[in-house]
From Swiss-Prot:
Oligomer and partners: Homodimer. Interacts with AKAP3 and RHPN1. May interact with SPA17. Interacts with FSCB; the interaction increases upon spermatozoa capacitation conditions. Interacts with CFAP61.
Post-translational modification summary for this protein: Sumoylated, sumoylation decreases upon spermatozoa capacitation conditions.
GO molecular function: identical protein binding
UniProt keyword terms in alphabetical order: Cell projection, Cilium, Flagellum, Phosphoprotein, Ubl conjugation
Domain RIIa: 12-49
Tissue: Testis specific in adult. Overexpressed in hematologic tumor cells.
Annotated region (Interaction with RHPN1), positions in chain: 209-212
Recorded family membership: Belongs to the ropporin family.
Chief localisation class: other
Keyword Protein transport (UniProt): no
Recorded domain comment: The RIIa domain mediates interaction with AKAP3.
Organism expressing this protein natively: Homo sapiens (Human)
Name of the protein this chain belongs to: Ropporin-1A
Length: 212
């Protein structure tokens, strides 16, 4: 009697494992993504720490620019206020400023972007390659988006901050939706003034605001 095919059993920890892999790939920006992925999962299978290094420990590619808030600000100015941008156009912008293609692909994969990209979501994930933590990521996003040239703390509309914080926390997967909601409600009621603006200092210098 022929054997029946056994159903594929997906371990419950797989989604979290893949999410951690994707975040690590954005931070490391490996030159050879396939080889790095093989080394990453081989280390996991042996119970060892995967080859995840912080940016300060990596050597920049000799012919590639390092991702910086300044370069992201240039890209943001080129997007010119659009909420949606086509992937092909954004990829060309990315290429013009000489940023690594692997990093672009990693952000595309983590965000599950297709032909049309929500620019603020893409920008938030690109900033996470620099920020590592959610608070630092949001600080960088605010610096990129801020149009305040008076030398004060970078500032953006609180509605934009709400959108970014909620999205980044969802992608990160380590912070509950209830915590995000609680922090946003506190800031809206106790921190944000009638102008509806939030500054970087509002969420980095206030001990009652714990985004993570």
């Amino acid at each position: 009697m022929a054997q029946t095919d056994k159903p594929t059993c997906i371990p419950p920890e797989l989604p979290k494992m893949l999410k951690e892999f994707a975040k690590a790939a954005i931070r490391v920006q490996p030159q050879d993504l396939i080889q790095w992925a093989a080394d990453y999962f081989e280390a996991l299978s042996r119970g060892e720490t995967p080859p995840v290094r912080e940016r300060s420990e990596r050597v920049a590619l000799c012919n590639r620019a390092e991702l910086t808030p300044e370069l992201l600000k240039i890209l943001h100015s080129q997007v010119a206020g659009r909420l949606i941008i086509r992937a092909e156009e954004l990829a060309q912008m990315w290429k013009v400023v000489n940023l690594p293609t692997d990093l672009f692909n990693s952000v595309m994969n983590v965000g599950r972007f297709t032909e049309e990209i929500e620019w603020l979501k893409f920008l938030a994930l690109a900033c996470s390659a620099l920020g590592v933590t959610i608070t630092k990521t949001l600080k960088i996003v605010c610096e990129v988006l801020s149009c305040d040239h008076n030398g004060g703390s970078p500032r953006i509309p609180f509605s934009t901050f709400q959108f970014l914080y909620t999205y980044i926390a969802k992608v990160d997967g380590e912070i509950s939706a209830s915590h995000v909601s609680r922090m946003l409600n506190y800031m809206e009621q106790e921190v944000i003034g009638p102008d509806g603006i939030i500054t970087v200092n509002d969420f980095t210098q206030n001990p009652r605001v714990q985004l993570e």
